[in-house]
Amino acid sequence: MDASDTPTHPAPHPADPAATPYGAPTTPPRPLRSRFTVRDVAAAKNRGEKWSMLTAYDATTAAVFDEAEIPVLLVGDSAANVVYGYDTTVPITVDELLPLVRAVVRGAPHAMVVADLPFGSYQGGPAEALASATRFLKEGGAHAVKLEGGSRVVRAVDALVGAGIPVIGHLGLTPQSIHTIGGYRVQGRDEAGEILLADALALEAAGAFAVVLEVVPADLATRVTKELRIATVGIGAGSGCDAQVLVWQDMAGLSGGRTPRFVKRYADLRTILADAARAYRADVRDGRYPTIEHSY
């Protein structure tokens, strides 16, 4: 090939997705707004300003949600289900979650990234919790951690906060305890509501900056929200919480089968992706792809 045959297209900018073979993101864009922090959570509570949280498990999705100004991204142990294909959240490990945390942090320069402490990484007590949480901040780049349980994890929360690690608690339906609570059902009814409130207050006293309330009666969640100085994050807990969180595949309609009652689908991504994949398969089969415009 002589010089006249050499392509003359300008080299793409290093931050341009086209600069990589598969259109994957390279370095995140320079932040134009500051990263959301624990102080912002407290300020929003004081102003009565609601905020949103979504799960994320990879850099590309994290970048999309960061662009949409979702302030908090949770690398949840729900990755056990939606990434690794486990039936419950119980099997996932710290080592399986850490690469996902790193990816989300790289993709989201503005969001607070929260890492779930998986089952078996903190139940042994404060020392185990501190070792696990430290890995997520030091090796993963997370900005906070989340753990399930009330009074039984208060000592662990106190140790984490004392070490400078921001903590979100999680009450109500706690999926890591699914074998104990006997299934996915509403928690906190009747006298159990008083126990949940006491647990929430105990987490607040231990230094947690927020608490997730999952699948609890809306009136109970509203009461807890009013009683606490820290933020409440609802998932199946009504509109009275300070914030809301959803698994992004549920929110975007990518999950298959029935979704929980509390999920609102904002798109039908499963159908869109399936249709796109079928169209691609048909084009390849019938010789319609690639064409000259897709060739060098």
Swiss-Prot record:
The lineage of its organism: Bacteria, Bacillati, Actinomycetota, Actinomycetes, Frankiales. InterPro entries: Pantoate_hydroxy_MeTrfase, Pyrv/PenolPyrv_kinase-like_dom, Pyrv_kinase-like_dom_sf. The gene is panB. This is 3-methyl-2-oxobutanoate hydroxymethyltransferase. Its main location: cytoplasm. CDD domains: KPHMT-like. It comes from Frankia casuarinae (strain DSM 45818 / CECT 9043 / HFP020203 / CcI3). Residues 16-25 have a biased composition (Low complexity). NCBIfam families: panB, PRK00311.1. Binds 1 Mg(2+) ion per subunit. Its EC number is 2.1.2.11. Belongs to the PanB family. Mg(2+) binds at residues 77, 116, 148. One of its GO terms (biological process) is pantothenate biosynthetic process.
